[in-house]
Amino acid sequence: MRFLIPLLPEVAEHWAWFVVTMALISIFYGALLALMQINFRRLLAFAIISQTGLIVIGLFDFNTYGMEGSIILSVSFGLATAGMLLSLGMIYKRTHTAFIPRLGGMFDTNAAIAVLFVICALSTMVMPGTPGFDGIHLLIEGTIKGQGWLVAIAILFGNVLTVGLLLRAFQQIFIATPRRSQEPFANTRHASSLPSPRNEWIIAIIICGSLIATGIHTSPWLHIIDQNIDSISNVYSNTGTHYPDTLTTQPIISKDN
């Protein structure tokens, strides 16, 4: 958005159909592959691929709503992904395994890790009260205007898959009982014997608090974003591509910033 769309608007619009098609494929491809994983690292990696497709579609809507939604989702997914990676790292530190069938029942003694994972997962699911909710609302509105109803509906179905895979991962890791024997890991420290220390609670509170605070009070973020993307979104009109004479001299970021 900082370089391709302002510098090459004709090229961006000409290839928008291809980019949006590949983004839609990545949404479903990443989500379906994530559902098939039994390694939580690979699961999260494919889930990130799926969510990246949403951001790309918003950028190529070529309107203010879509671009605002993409930026808000970028912030939301960045915080949420960091939180989930951190929680999974804590799990691996305890169990020395990333194999989901060997995990389970970790909520009772590792509540901080569970709370961190579920709040970040809810933000990735774009639930109300998280920044992802406002971001997906703007993204869908921009997609309806820029790409049409079919693409917007496809985005919603892709998000349903993301909800399913993250809830399934939470259930298998933190609630369900292990489906495989722990014998190969008998010499390692099991998660149930290591309750969450104070520093893990502090980290969980900071990340979860940032997500919730950003989700409840999104207006300042939108105000900052509006100042920086107006010069980009105004390049395009609803009836076609319009290139104002000031495009080459208008700064992408206002001087007030």
Where are these regions (language model features)?
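Hydrophobic transmembrane alpha-helices and their helix-loop junctions in integral membrane proteins
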Residues: 1-137, 141-171
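Cytoplasmic/organellar membrane-interface segments at the starts of transmembrane helices
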Residues: 110-112, 168-257
